[in-house]
Amino acid sequence: MHVFDAAAVHAALPWPFLIEALRKTHFGPMPASDVVVQSDPAGGEAQFVTLPGWAPGGPVVVKMVGVFPHNAALQPPQPAVQGLVALFDGKTGGPLLAADGAAMTARKTAADSALGAAILAREDVEDLLIVGAGALAPHFAEAHMAARPSLRRVTIWNRTAARAEAVAATLREKGIDATVSGDLDRSVAGADVVSCVTMSDTALVKGALLRPGTHLDLVGAYLPHLREADDAALARGTIFVDSRNNMEGGGDLSQAVASGAITWESVKADLFELVQGKREGRTGRDQITVFKNNGGAHLDLFTASALSETLG
């Protein structure tokens, strides 16, 4: 069995390779998957989540992840999300590889949104706004730039400016033109692509400010009480999701449905339908596209399978 630490995961899965691997696997069927959530028996906010997935005639993945929101306050700080991803032979059950869970999550989550942008964003986009400055932020900037090479500039906004500057500095070290925004509304109005990677429980992106042709990527609101974009953003945009199977769990769509701004029928397609050509993506230059990244064990399986390909 091969073991990949975080550095090995990132090195083995460059963005162009992984985005293309995800595109190819979306030509196949949706794998069987499940989610088992164990809440902290002491009553705290922490959770331990197990996500198994099994492709028909293919391998089995099990992602084991701890979500501990207060880890950032520890000394020294630790990631809020940690775990392991294990891949098994679907015929024998034998273990094939184990990989650092945080690195795998960062890679697959960013590549998921990047594939959405590759299909839905205009081909001439230049300005990318990343809303949020957590661990995923630099990965989302790099993945989007790989998916849409026309992107020239990255702006980072975060409630804590110092954290935004740290992300921007990391990107500049890699030769990316990255700056910090002190005015979210102005940056939203000036962006071609807006990618939200936060844990916000109130809407940050105002739909009225989105200019025609913008691509809006929503990632962080994976629980019903979380929200990254307001009703106007969902109502103005044409909505797409990575998978219809788990699209009702996050707050952006479910809250907009509850308010009457949209219906579940407003979701035009998921990545399987888009990749397979069963549904249309962007149909006009001025169309606002909204992509809701919900994640799921199928993406862990696709990413782990891509990692196994690198073993030869």
Annotated model-derived regions:
Residues 128-129, 289:
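Conserved beta-strand elements of the Class I
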Residues 147-174:
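NAD(P)-binding Rossmann-fold cofactor-contacting core
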Residues 174-256, 261:
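Rossmann-like adenosine-cofactor binding region
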Residues 133-134:
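Glycine-rich Rossmann-fold phosphate-binding loop(s) that bind the pyrophosphate
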Residues 1-106, 114, 124, 298-301, ...:
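N-terminal ligand-binding/catalytic initiation module
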Residues 137-138:
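N-terminal Rossmann-fold NAD(P) dinucleotide-binding loop
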